[in-house]
């Protein structure tokens, strides 16, 4: 369960980094990371309004606030159906391929987080080699220049 939170904290912290790359947002990317961050940032800021960059705990709290982390049978699971709905309107290109990748990686409504996210981001990288979000996810957290977008 701890690795669950670590993976998602890294995912969303890496997404925050993508804001600094906004000038290149359409350079091979498939997912508009700026739009994704704009959606999740209020939930994260509600948990930790003065923390920059937001800690893993703040990001985890934000995911719970957004309704993406749910508890089932005592285990915390990631709701990929809800994540798919949140991606609507935030995909720049290859929309069908992105949704197909999500379905291939998670065939149920709730899936274990770490293997599903690894699968999804590997598939996105294959389809969108210029997508910086997936490249950032492979970087060690300590090497990322994390910052929170201004509200």
Curated annotation (Swiss-Prot):
It comes from the Eukaryota. Contains 5 disulfide bonds. One of its GO terms (molecular function) is toxin activity. Its main location: secreted. Residues 1-22 form the signal peptide. GO terms for cellular component: extracellular region. Belongs to the scoloptoxin-17 family. This is U-scoloptoxin(17)-Er2a.
